[in-house]
Amino acid sequence: MSRLEKIYTNKENPLKDFLDEVEQNDEEMRTVDFNPNKPALPYKKKAIVFPKNFPSETHYNNGVPIGKQLNLGGSVQQVIGGINTILEVLSFLCLRQLPIVASSSHEQLENSKEFKNELQNHLTKITEQLEINRKSIIKDQTVKEDLNKKQYETLYALQEKLLNMLAEKQSSNELKNLERRLDEKIKIIEQQLSEIKLMLS
């Protein structure tokens, strides 16, 4: 495991393994009173001084090339290297917060999934209720249509019956009129016969 991986994975004291490994690999590392003019990492109110041969995951701790026209010595490169190393360490100290953030994100994701499931269940219940309502409405509509059909058939039958009764009544009236006229004709004929008998006697 590299020192940066240890910084990343050690949650209790992310600097401890890092410092132990540096002490084992480089005896020149020491803690002194902090001097801003020297590349160092503050630690326990002291300063960890980084020598030039400080082992690193990158090339930054050895500094970056400075143009010769600036006429700057190696100490400047060492300062820049120390600053870059400090930035490297601090960056990975920040990275160790990622599991916490990831855990929080995972929890939020789980909550989101739970909310999604609850919403899905709620929508499913609403859909089921709507389907029940739809079937109930169709059933009621069918009952009403059947009732209207029966009422129409009943009304039609009553209409036919009424028409037949009217026809029968009309026929009866015509028959009575015919009988009355026939009686009148008979009376006239009887009267004429009586007159003829009188004339012959």
UniProtKB/Swiss-Prot annotation:
Superkingdom to which the source organism belongs: Viruses
Official protein name in the record: Uncharacterized protein 2
In its UniProt entry, the species of origin is given as Soybean chlorotic mottle virus
